[in-house]
Regions:
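C-terminal binding/interaction regions
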Residues: 1-76, 81-167
């Protein structure tokens, strides 16, 4: 089956997907990425009279999720119910994991990915002096739950793990 792009109309022109007829349901998505660095989480410890970089990264992620439609063309403006940003040590650096939940007519995959990317950028900015060759890697959607296409992703158990036919 040939895949069709959801944001391209029959005449080949870009369009915002019309979600008017979709049901309002609970939707969630989880994304992750790695900030690959030789520095450890100790490099993120706040110094005296400085803002905590972990808190700053969480705020950056939440703010970015809320503004996804301003940052990514053709994304719908959504009222989000919850945005969670977690930073954990990883053998290659720091893992950023985000979960976004909303009760809407469309999914929150882009919001989860955007939150993850911006939280990682905030950490990257903090690490520039400690590790100027740090990089952001493996930005990926781990799962999405809800909506017409059902549950799918790398972490979805007992579900069709293939993405929907529209991309």
């Amino acid at each position: 089956m040939e895949r069709e792009f959801s944001h391209i109309n029959a005449m080949g022109k870009l369009r915002m997907v019309d979600v008017t007829s979709k049901r309002i349901t609970r939707r969630s998505a989880m994304a992750r990425c790695l900030v690959v660095t030789s520095a450890d989480m100790g490099a993120l410890e706040p110094r005296e009279d400085e803002i905590d970089p972990v808190i700053c990264a969480r705020i950056a992620g939440v703010s970015a999720a809320k503004r996804t439609s301003e940052l990514i063309p053709l994304c719908h403006t959504l009222n989000l119910n919850d945005v969670n940003v977690e930073l954990t040590p990883h053998d290659r650096g720091i893992e950023v994991t985000t979960t976004v939940t909303a009760t809407q007519r469309t999914g929150v995959e882009m919001e989860a990915l955007t939150a993850c990317a911006f939280a990682a950028l905030s950490i990257f900015n903090t690490l520039l002096l400690a590790d100027p060759i740090a990089l952001i890697d493996e930005l990926e959607l781990l799962k999405k739950v809800g909506g017409k296409s059902g549950n799918w992703g790398r972490l979805v158990e007992d579900a069709d793990k293939k993405p929907p036919t529209s991309v």
